Amino acid sequence: MNNLIKSKLELLPTSPGCYIHKDKNGTIIYVGKAKNLRNRVRSYFRGSHDTKTEALVSEIVDFEFIVTESNIEALLLEINLIKENKPKYNIMLKDDKSYPFIKITNERYPRLIITRQVKKDGGLYFGPYPDVGAANEIKRLLDRIFPFRKCTNPPSKVCFYYHIGQCMAHTICKKDEAYFKSMAQEVSDFLKGQDNKIIDELKGKMAAAAQTMEFERAAEYRDLIQAIGTLRTKQRVMAKDLQNRDVFGYYVDKGWMCVQVFFVRQGKLIERDVNLFPYFNDPDEDFLTYVGQFYQEKSHLVPNEVLIPQDIDEEAVKALVDSKILKPQRGEKKQLVNLAIKNARVSLEQKFNLLEKSVEKTQGAIENLGRLLQIPTPVRIESFDNSNIMGTSPVSAMVVFVNGKPSKKDYRKYKIKTVVGPDDYASMREVIRRRYGRVQREALTPPDLIVIDGGQGQVHIAKQVIQEELGLDIPIAGLQKNDKHQTHELLFGDPLEVVELSRNSQEFFLLQRIQDEVHRFAITFHRQLRSKNSFSSQLDGIEGLGPKRKQNLMKHFKSLTKIKEASVDDIVEVGVPRAVAEAVQRKLNPQEAEALLQVAEERVDYQTEGNHNEP
């Protein structure tokens, strides 16, 4: 905790409000609310916390606060601040998950469409449905029963759907708007489960068609009746009152929260929404934040009722959702909330079980690898790979895996300094010497295993440096790739031998991940260096363009191509003098500069000729 934070903590009021944590760059990393700002904000800097809260606190270098009149006002402000600033430690609902709806458009001749956008446009919306497939299935059924307009713009002639009885052909139809409103009401009744009237009508039409020997038409009506029956069986009735409601339940454990929302429409459970995330405050308050974001961000209709658990502030939810808010005490609605809570608990337990299995697999992989190589369990593994193209911009990279997982803070990049040309062995010698010479000098923690991305030659070089030059005792293994550039063989021992390794084993998958990661890291560094060198070389020799201005150009435009495409004014905006900006454009676009020069010369010649003709 720095002196600025200590001073500000003394100034905190006991009022409700929002607090805003910032990192060293002034970026907002967390927004929270509190009934008592002094108690809540001070709690971050006192006592011990779990790992995720420690990670948050370690990044806080400043905070601000906003006092509000009430806790509900603080809740609304918090939701807006999160939406505006998108802090990395706050709950952020995914915007890409929107559910499909069936819509009857508000047009003179209405259409039946599927949409993911719910707008206040006078249209009738039904849903949400679990996926587009389910919505399409129902829409196809409705199209066969109700002849709504199919075309976006009514055609001048009757369309194909008119001939198969699925369109009224509005170009020749004499029906008034009241007729279509009536048909829309029938669709609404049907989607609410009130389909007995339609089934009776279809049965009557089927019987009439059979009496007149129109058996194909009768079969069509029969299929429609069966399709409605199938649709009924797919939707489980959860409530007898056939209300539209959202049912919320949540469960917390080990610093994580799971919220489940059941979408119950016309008494039937049609879909659920599941979200798992870490929480930093009181779970009830973080749940309220979630509900506020849910109805602010998610594209779906607010239902007639919202059911919430007992321990949630009902008035706070009412401020967030324009709907009837209930905390059921008993009966069918209470069972729905309990079911949502139970499912939230199951989802959270599944997450922890999967994490435990992942840890077990990773731990088992490094233990098996140790047994296979007859060395202590390699908790820390360091791996190296070189990268160059025909000896240009040679680099090397080191990745570190601790307990079988990447430790990216320990990754290192190396520019090759002493090697000229494409000499992979010499490059490996330099990098191993630099890395473990430093480990020796600074008494750093050595790895339990070194993995070289290469064959016998590279491994021998590494052994010479580690064992003979530096006198260190660190096991060294090599990973060879096959012709398809895939992990193929593990080399180990003295002399080096191929270690038999099952390709389906966890230890093989671990080594494969290590090899892929060090290759990716080395290649990425090499590309960055090549790009930077290319950038520098093409901008060398421009008077007034020093290293700092080159760096600013690259930071702003990201690539040489973007600078080539930029105008002189664009370059000037980065802080480059106009004369220098013009020189940059001439250097990067010589053909264009030559053409402009030629035009200028022709203009001068023309003016000169004109002067000669004067009397």
From Swiss-Prot:
UVR domain span: 196-231
SMART domains the record matches: GIYc
UniProt key word Cell cycle: no
Keyword Chaperone (UniProt): no
GO molecular function terms noted in the UniProt entry: DNA binding; excinuclease ABC activity
Keywords for the protein's UniProt record, in alphabetical order: Cytoplasm, DNA damage, DNA excision, DNA repair, Excision nuclease, SOS response
Compartments where located: Cytoplasm
Gene Ontology cellular-component annotations: cytoplasm; excinuclease repair complex
SUPFAM superfamilies from the UniProt entry: C-terminal UvrC-binding domain of UvrB, GIY-YIG endonuclease, RuvA domain 2-like
All copies of domain GIY-YIG, residue ranges: 14-91
Gene Ontology BP term (one): nucleotide-excision repair
Disulfide bonds: none
Source domain of life: Bacteria
Pfam families: GIY-YIG (PF01541), HHH_5 (PF14520), UVR (PF02151), UvrC_RNaseH (PF22920), UvrC_RNaseH_dom (PF08459)
Family the entry assigns: Belongs to the UvrC family.
Function: The UvrABC repair system catalyzes the recognition and processing of DNA lesions. UvrC both incises the 5' and 3' sides of the lesion. The N-terminal half is responsible for the 3' incision and the C-terminal half is responsible for the 5' incision.
Oligomeric form and interacting partners: Interacts with UvrB in an incision complex.
Annotated protein name in UniProt: UvrABC system protein C
Species: Streptococcus pneumoniae (strain Hungary19A-6)
Gene: uvrC
